[in-house]
Amino acid sequence: MRAAGKQLRDNQQMRIAAQQNPDGSAYTPRRPQVDDKTHKLRRSRARMFAKLSKTRWMAVRTTADSATIQFVAGAGRLANIHQHGLRDRVNKYGLQVQYPARQLLGFSDADIEMVREMLLATVGL
């Protein structure tokens, strides 16, 4: 189970880095930011969730019959907001913003097939 969990985590990390949902569609793009002084649009080319896709923030927990991939610490809160498209404050005293749903964790067809193959290889079929 541990090997399957690690492989799934690696697949999730690559997908998050590529800015894609499990079905292959692209994430909803960031909202354009406005400069407070000039009131013009800022050009931001930074990737979303750049640090969130690192191994440090994605934990694999395994038992004899299951594997779980989850975000740890404060990263879990941030990931939950984006996974489900919830409302949150931009900063401590800022406005509340409705974030679009961006599916960070999920199974693609390739992931399901990979887990199936690993389980069959373990059982010996």
Report the location of each language-model feature.
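C-terminal or internal capping secondary-structure element at the end of a domain, subdomain, or sheet
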Residues: 94-125
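Short, low-complexity, charged/polar segments at coil/turn and helix-coil boundaries
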Residues: 1-92
